[in-house]
Amino acid sequence: MKKSHAKPFALRAIVVATAAALSLPAAAVTDVTWEDIANDHKTTGDVLTYGLGLKAQRHSPLKAINTDNVANLVPAWSFSFGGEKQRGQEAQVLVHDGVIYATASYSRIFAIDARSGKRLWEYNARLPDDIRPCCDVVNRGAAIYGDKVFFGTLDAAMVALDRKTGKVVWRKKFGDHKVGYTMTGAPFVIKDQKSGRTLLVHGSSGDEFGVVGWLFARDPDTGEEVWARPMVEGHMGRLNGKDSTPTGDPKAPSWPDDPNSPTGKVEAWSQGGGAPWQTASFDVENNMVVIGAGNPAPWNTWKRTAPGDDPRNWDSLFTSGQAYVDASTGELKGFYQHTPNDAWDFSGNNSVVLFEYKDPKTGKMVNASAHADRNGFFFVTDRDMLAKGAGYPNKPTSLIGAWPFVDGITWASGFDLKTGKPIEKDNRPPQPKEGADKGESIFVSPPFLGGTNWHPMSYSPDTGLFYIPANHWAMDYWTENVTYKAGSAYLGQGFRIKNLFDDHVGILRAIDPSPARSLGAQGRVPAVAGTLTTAGGWVFTGTSDGYLKAFDAKNGKELWKFQTGSGVVSVPVTWEMDGEQYVAIQSGYGGAVPLWGGDMAELTKQVTQGGSMWVFKLPKASR
């Protein structure tokens, strides 16, 4: 995923589980149905999904706030998450029946009156002091269905709460937090198109501690596991509580053998990573859960390469790519790998946005996926081919195109559209020489923090453009010796993040998809907040030095900004209530950059911590 060889951020406080303050009146809350969720992309009174729809396009049809009046936005209210529990606030909120559901750092969730900003209830998870989040004590959001709201906790549990009261309905552990399992991403609700069963889908986190990543589907009423899919080739999945099928080839040929190992494979295979720690999208037509798979463990590519061999001969499947999983069985139907045998921690977790792509050669529309990867390339893949097994041996590639969206990429010059493989430059970090503790340092761009990180992009069907919060930066990078030890960081790489250019780091990029073109929106500090588009013609995002900003979606002109008092590393939403359009975003600096960002951490050290949510609307005179 995204941090250094330093010790993980340690928690020392025990947080008491509470459901506090006022509960919601029964008449005020209606159950959320599957039809509500399936229509989230076109309804305007609620925000029911992470991504504003099953396709994760993050586009709203609302247009009361437009390019002519967005400069008049004013705060409607703000809400403090309170206490000393600040750190990074990375969540996207949900909105239903006039109530906002907002998760916050340290595994907390709040129900807030959307009209007044009044707290209705609060739930604080009881966290042990031996949890191991790699990249801050963050939470990125919740899911909502029926009369419940769901979110994950840093001690590797999924929790269901009564939406009216905040009381726990069920809680399920899915991994051992002491060895590194945790959860930071928002869960997602889908409906199996074959059985008609509604499922709660979520992944695990923990690649940096050498744990195998898993994708889970649960019964939202009981929390019971329906299926579970490991993301490392050859590991066994589960269905209805029993072993089902291995992921890919049971012999795991993309990972080297080791005759001296009890498993017959190299150590890394047993600890192989691939955690799907971000939130899924859902391909209804093909009945597939679509999600990014994380980096292999350890980062050290030589630990996943046969002795004396070329790392490019090994893929470390099924890591650092986009996975297509059968909603009925949990079988891996297809896979596209962005970075084979990933040596740079580029991972593959960034959002996978589903859209319809017009083939410029034939004019035909293709059911496609779009993904802006940390490796600096923007990918378009064919979903229908992935539903038929693309990515497996002897199957054609699903890759339609791959375009760079940042400058100065050092690891590859492009992609072969026939094979789907990168055209690598000779830029993998060398092994330590005999007797040395570390290898020779190399210059890498983008760094492991990525050309863009997890912060989700948006897609506007009005402009046909994707809007990516991108960064121009680099790192010095060297290999270190590493052996697995339970509960310890399992990297085998050292690094120092640094500037690529003197005049900027963050940049808002638009891609159509074709060669990326800049919208002209650059910043001195990293761009580490998600984007939102609307039919009003603007793009909304935040900056790590505390601003919320609106840009013209056609030309990138800055139209409005507001200083929140702390860095913005979250994801904006918009909805309509009482005839008015609202915009909301969280403020509170944290995440990977201040912890592991090297020179970039120095660049933002003046940014104060915070923990708040801001809600905006137009004054009456401007409507």
UniProtKB/Swiss-Prot annotation:
Induction (free text): By butane, 1-butanol and 2-butanol.
Family annotation (Gene3D superfamilies): Quinoprotein alcohol dehydrogenase-like superfamily
Subcellular location: Periplasm
GO cellular component, one term: outer membrane-bounded periplasmic space
Stretches the record annotates as Disordered: 235-274, 420-440
Record text on cofactor binding: Binds 1 PQQ group per subunit. PQQ is inserted between disulfide Cys-134-Cys-135 and the plane of Trp-277.
Annotated keywords: Calcium, Disulfide bond, Metal-binding, Oxidoreductase, Periplasm, PQQ, Signal
Main location (coarse class): periplasm
Binding site for Ca(2+) 1: D40, T43, D46
Signal peptide range: 1-28
Cofactors required: pyrroloquinoline quinone; Ca(2+)
Family under the similarity heading: Belongs to the bacterial PQQ dehydrogenase family.
Function (record text): Involved in the metabolism of butane. May function primarily in energy generation. Catalyzes the oxidation of 1-butanol to 1-butanal. Also able to use 2-butanol and butyraldehyde, although the affinity is comparatively low.
UniProt-recorded name of the protein: 1-butanol dehydrogenase (quinone)
